[in-house]
């Protein structure tokens, strides 16, 4: 059994709706274990750094503004196939295209305010996890 880790961020829109617990319940029911978590208000610098790969995209500034508009819940999830399992729970980036019962279909407002971020590959997950968490903050379960 090969365990993977993925980074998950519950975005300001979902935090404002008070659905963190609902989302965590879905993670746990799907076999994803929370091995690190922090509730925080991202600074502009943190948001710009995290989304630096999108710096030249037309939506970059709006994305940064949205991500600093309120607190976020950031967690590291662990399981077999964690990246794919988490992305399946999230649903399509655009909630209009997300399957019924997915996090984005149930809690997202728009493609911009789409409730949650999930790493798109094992390689990016490692980079994203390290961006927000020191190795000592990740607790094995």
Swiss-Prot record:
Its EC number is 2.7.4.6. SMART domains: NDK. ATP binds at residues 11, 59, 87, 93, 104, 114. It is an enzyme of class 2 (transferase). GO terms for biological process: CTP biosynthetic process; GTP biosynthetic process; UTP biosynthetic process. Its cofactor is Mg(2+). Homotetramer. InterPro entries: NDK-like_dom (IPR034907), NDK-like_dom_sf (IPR036850), Nucleoside_diP_kinase (IPR001564), Nucleoside_diP_kinase_AS (IPR023005). This is Nucleoside diphosphate kinase. The active site is at 117 (pros-phosphohistidine intermediate). Keywords: ATP-binding, Cytoplasm, Kinase, Magnesium, Metal-binding, Nucleotide metabolism, Nucleotide-binding, Phosphoprotein, Transferase. It is found in: Cytoplasm. Belongs to the NDK family. GO terms for cellular component: cytoplasm. It comes from Xylella fastidiosa (strain 9a5c). It catalyses: a 2'-deoxyribonucleoside 5'-diphosphate + ATP = a 2'-deoxyribonucleoside 5'-triphosphate + ADP; a ribonucleoside 5'-diphosphate + ATP = a ribonucleoside 5'-triphosphate + ADP. The gene is ndk. Major role in the synthesis of nucleoside triphosphates other than ATP. The ATP gamma phosphate is transferred to the NDP beta phosphate via a ping-pong mechanism, using a phosphorylated active-site intermediate. PROSITE patterns: NDPK, NDPK_LIKE. Its main location: cytoplasm. One of its GO terms (molecular function) is nucleoside diphosphate kinase activity.
